[in-house]
């Protein structure tokens, strides 16, 4: 009898401690960190694609929260949000990256997310594909409606892609964030509205005569870009609208020297010209 009583006394503090921890730490958070990378409400998903697949197609706004970092290693890992789905992707300070790959024919080539629906990205996360030298085109390929509230988005300099690519008929709104690393930070063929952000480009035609770009490009006869504020820095050039409509209300546009070839390759900080169709600038 004494032995049993003594055991109970020893176990009592343990059970009290466990109960205290369980009360402080939500059950869903524990499971999310151990067995999944994304969460909708209390439901945990093993992949971001599984979470996107669970979102209703009737336009209901659904928050998907990342609970762990994600590393993609092959093309099948690229995530697609289908038309009709409305997602707020809370990066929750996490990251989505490409696995390191320096081969000329990488196992993974593209951007981490293809958006055909309505996607809002928030939560100050990182989307970085720069580890794949020739396959890390950038972060987001937008065919739908994309809103970026904050975060850091990086592509691979030599992959000949854009960190954010806004396709024809797509709509893009950027409130803030850092966009850099890729051949081009923002390539717009649709409608893009920029309220703030930092856009950096380091490509240089003297370093590579076939892979270089202005940092921001407005590049379609039907493209429309409304730029209210932000900082655009480029080695080859900062902002280019060679087609479509560009309205610039403020911001800083700057060219910087190539660390190898100096200022020789630099084009214009701000370039507006009708290379394709008729260009309007206001």
Language model feature labels by segment:
Residues 4-15:
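Bacterial N-terminal signal peptides that target proteins for export
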Residues 59-63, 84-86, 222, 276:
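A general structural motif
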Residues 72-88, 97-122, 130-146, 164-168, ...:
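Extracellular beta-strand-rich solenoid/capping regions of secreted or surface-exposed proteins
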Residues 67-73, 93:
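Generic short beta-strand segments
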């Amino acid at each position: 009898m004494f032995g049993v009583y003594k055991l109970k006394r020893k176990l009592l503090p343990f059970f009290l401690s466990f109960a205290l921890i369980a009360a402080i730490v939500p059950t869903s958070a524990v499971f999310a960190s151990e067995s999944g990378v994304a969460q909708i409400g209390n439901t945990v998903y093993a992949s971001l694609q599984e979470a996107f697949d669970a979102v209703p197609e009737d336009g209901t706004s659904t928050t998907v929260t990342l609970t762990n970092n994600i590393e993609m290693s092959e093309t099948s890992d690229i995530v697609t949000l289908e038309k009709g789905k409305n997602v707020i992707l809370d990066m929750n300070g996490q990251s989505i990256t490409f696995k390191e790959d320096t081969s000329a024919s990488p196992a993974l080539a593209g951007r981490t997310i293809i958006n055909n629906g309505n996607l809002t990205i928030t939560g100050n996360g990182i989307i970085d594909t720069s580890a794949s030298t020739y396959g890390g085109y950038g972060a987001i390929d937008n065919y739908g409606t994309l809103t970026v509230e904050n975060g850091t988005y990086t592509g691979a300099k030599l992959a000949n892609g854009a960190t954010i690519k806004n396709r024809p008929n797509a709509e893009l709104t950027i409130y803030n964030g850092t966009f850099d690393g890729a051949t081009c930070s923002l390539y717009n063929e649709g409608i893009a509205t920029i309220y703030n952000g930092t856009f950096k480009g380091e490509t240089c035609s003297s370093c590579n005569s076939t892979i270089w770009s202005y940092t921001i490009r407005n590049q379609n006869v039907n493209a429309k870009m409304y730029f209210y504020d932000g900082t655009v820095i480029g080695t080859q050039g900062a902002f280019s609208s060679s087609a479509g409509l560009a309205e610039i209300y403020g911001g800083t546009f700057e060219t910087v020297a190539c660390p190898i070839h100096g200022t020789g390759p630099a084009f214009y900080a701000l370039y507006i010209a009708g290379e394709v169709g008729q260009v309007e600038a206001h």
